[in-house]
Amino acid sequence: MADRIQVVIALPRDEALPIDVQAVGLRRMAIDLMKEVADVEENTVRYTGGTDNATINFGGEIGLLTTWQHNLLAARFVADGTAKKEVVGPIVHRDTVTRVHSSASVERNPY
């Protein structure tokens, strides 16, 4: 059984698009983030949900982030893959200019 890779992305919300339409468009960005922590099987990448009304704990330098106060959309993606051996925790990115925040983490298969 493969390791489970999870990515959470928060970025500025586009009011002209429904949440799911905007979030599904982030799939390629999620795959690129997943490749930082694992070898990902791209056909297993799934969008599991998006919201503009949540408090998210990204950890690292970002910490807690409220999407509604910052007018952000948050989307979660999961996939199967093989975690890289050097990854021991989540990888967190923050871009203050574009207001894009992301976190990629791995849940290792114990078997």
Swiss-Prot record:
It holds the Pfam family GP44. InterPro entries: Gp44 (IPR035252). This is Gene 44.1 protein. The gene is 44.1.
